[in-house]
């Protein structure tokens, strides 16, 4: 794997190369999850996650989609929107003039989760210093929400603009509520953009399914992301990381928008993507590596194999072991499809992988 043949991402302007991160780089490799968690019990989820991901690792506020409508990632984020409302139709979440019962249900579920988090954290002898929360980013939000006529909001320039602005306005209140639940905790935000590559490529289907929507402009995508990321930082986020699938992942666009790092699975990363990640790490950015494949249903990979999946390309690119502290290891996807016992095992395995990377870093 060579780093001499580097081709810039077409979504990023030449003048907007990643600069030094504003967030402090971790001193050692750590572990976290991506948010989705099995079951319907926020108390059990919080206890397990905070128990398995104690310091220096990164516990997270669980998303529990098994509870139904409003606890899914899209509905949870839609409930944060300022001066915009949603309801649910047979084809999905729809923008409306007044909040529907599903939006109220989403807001209620989030309030419950924050109250439970406050209780669990308050009962700990030694509370975690960091906490991660997740939300859907403006591009995937526009792809997932529908207009009054049933078409995707992504189709309409004004709707895209209003959604990004509404989300940016709403995240401040959300982070203040999280901070009140866990006073003194350093907040990390994971912005999920599962549809970003499809938005940029023009492969999102219309409501009818017979056509696809026009490819989104990279410049507009970058500015929408920048607006939300800046709002998160202004609201107190210490780190903001963009998470997306690895296929056609717009790594340089994400960093040009101001992200402190990117989170993506390792399984299908190309040489070019590894080169982009190497440049980002050297510039002080973080890489959240989806080292643990949880999509196959097979037994979890061995710790040594997971460590090697990072170290081999890392070493081939000439990156020093000392920079392994810029890595957080994650599963390849959310854990909602696992059993609670399996999900717990995944978190334990991830902390072991982080330990293995730290041993390499120490030489």
Segments from the language model and where they lie:
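A solvent-exposed, charged loop/short amphipathic helix patch at secondary-structure junctions
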Residues: 146-161, 204-216
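Active-site-proximal loop/turn and secondary-structure-junction residues that shape catalytic pockets
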Residues: 137-139, 193-195, 246-248, 268, ...
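Structured alpha-helical segments in the cores of large, soluble enzyme domains
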Residues: 117-120, 174-178, 221-232, 276-278, ...
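Glycine-rich anion/phosphate-binding loops
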Residues: 102-119, 162-174, 304-309
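Active-site groove signature of glycoside hydrolases
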Residues: 132-137, 181-192, 325-330
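Active-site loop segments of alpha/beta catalytic cores
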Residues: 166, 170-269
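Alpha/beta catalytic barrel-like cores
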Residues: 1-136, 140-155, 253-260, 285, ...
